Amino acid sequence: MEKSITNSPVLSILSYCAASILMTVTNKYVLSGTSFNLNLALLAVQSIVCLTAISIGKSFGLCKFRSFNADEAKKWFPIALLLVVMIYTSSKALQFLSIPVYTIFKNLTIILIAYGEVLWFGGSVTSMALASFVLMVLSSVIAAWSDISGAIAVSGSATTTVTALNIGYFWMMSNCFASAAFVLYMRKRIKLTNFGDFDTTFYNNLLSIPVLLIASLLFEDWSPANLAVNFPPESRNLIFFSMVVSGLMSIGISYCSAWCVRVTSSTTYSMVGALNKLPLALSGIVFFGTPATFSSVSAIFVGFVAGIVYAVAQIQKKKAEAALPK
């Protein structure tokens, strides 16, 4: 029974969807303050909390994963490094962009992963999948136009607003490339190492911590003045609590990502992310008061349709492959 649950594609997909929504909303809350600039420190805290929690779980027999092995760690380190780049660029993008825009642009990762599978795993792209890619790009264009025009209308300063959003789009595109590289490389390495889901979570977080801490100490401002700005007395305890909660949330997204990739495929994993964009984008409107304009809702809808078209394309592709003579 337990084995059938851990190998269930449907359950892994639903769990990944729930975890990604919780993680995005929690991170957006922590990063929503314009003064917060210790992104690497936040990510280090998340990894430390996640590693501590699964280690406690292992000691109580709640989960199992391999003991540390230097040779395995050396082989897994590039993936952990890609994970650091992925979550850092994600946190920077969330600082500058609203959740709906962020989630719509994440669709572009699917295109990169699909063509990555063509190059490295002998995959193929059907005409229907190509049509979904066009819709994904269209939804991103609509979202960007809506975001820029809406922000200018609110602030009244076109130059400052466009500059800030351009920074956000730069981090967003960087995140798309990092996410695609992470998913593709992790799928290949999981097959070679035969890692379980908690093995992946353990090594991802363990190897990320020193990289994040060193990078934070080198590149972020740890002066008393900046710490006071990042953690003002009136909200300090709430920020600390939110950072710990986001770390606990990272267990869910880290485990569910590895689980979903293992029991499905990297392309299905990215497709699920696309279908998950509708509730994820709506969470930004519900929890953070993102304006629900005609253009922003249209962008969300087009992005959602793109995900459905892509899902249908993948189903048809699987049926066609199954019909081929063995």
Curated annotation (Swiss-Prot):
It comes from Yarrowia lipolytica (strain CLIB 122 / E 150). GO terms for biological process: GDP-mannose transmembrane transport. Its main location: Golgi. It is a multi-pass membrane protein. NCBIfam families: nst (TIGR00803). This is GDP-mannose transporter. Residues 26-35, 98-100, 153-163, 230-237, 290-291 are lumenal. Coiled coil: none annotated. Belongs to the TPT transporter family. SLC35D subfamily. Homooligomer.
